[in-house]
Amino acid sequence: MIDDDGYRPNVGIVICNRQGQVLWARRYGQHSWQFPQGGINPGESPEQAMYRELYEEVGLGRKDVRILASTRNWLRYKLPKRLVRWDTRPVCIGQKQRWFLLQLLCNEEDINVQHSNTPEFDGWRWVSYWYPVRQVVSFKRDVYRRVMKEFASVVMPMQESVSLPRSSYSYRRKRS
């Protein structure tokens, strides 16, 4: 489903732990990392799409998280011309996204990025709150900056109430 301007409606998901760190996922078979995200199906609300994508990409359900915030507006990014599929109709030039900030309620061992037949990710790790803004692929960077800035007032008090351990930069694979 592509809108009249060529943007695909999509949801993005920022999952934080009680220390205010965020889940950073490695794209399957690639060296790039990002937050979970995915398209909104026809007839689906952004919140419904978020819960579906949460399960598909991270293996978590409603009971495993709490919604702390969502972005007020749709945020857009354009795909680089080399990634646009010009032979499809309608042509998708980018994504418009509604973002959700979730707090993890379950044990982190319940996170399973490889539970589906076609996983989006092959590993994940906790990183400091602002780390993704510097590390995401360049064409998504402005959206990530805006999302993290909007959610900062919710997450920063969590970080202040707990002494933070250093972020681990080794990533986790789902156990076989």
Curated annotation (Swiss-Prot):
One of its GO terms (cellular component) is cytoplasm. Pfam families: NUDIX. It comes from the Bacteria. SUPFAM superfamilies: Nudix. It is an enzyme of class 3 (hydrolase). Keywords: Hydrolase. A motif (Nudix box) lies at residues 38-59. Its cofactor is a divalent metal cation. One of its GO terms (molecular function) is mRNA 5'-diphosphatase activity. Its EC number is 3.6.1.-. Residues 6-149 form the Nudix hydrolase domain. Gene3D superfamilies: Nucleoside Triphosphate Pyrophosphohydrolase. GO terms for biological process: mRNA catabolic process. InterPro entries: Nudix_hydrolase, NUDIX_hydrolase-like_dom_sf, NUDIX_hydrolase_CS, NUDIX_hydrolase_dom, RppH. Accelerates the degradation of transcripts by removing pyrophosphate from the 5'-end of triphosphorylated RNA, leading to a more labile monophosphorylated state that can stimulate subsequent ribonuclease cleavage. Belongs to the Nudix hydrolase family. RppH subfamily. This is RNA pyrophosphohydrolase. It comes from Photorhabdus laumondii subsp. laumondii (strain DSM 15139 / CIP 105565 / TT01). The lineage of its organism: Bacteria, Pseudomonadati, Pseudomonadota, Gammaproteobacteria, Enterobacterales. The gene is rppH.
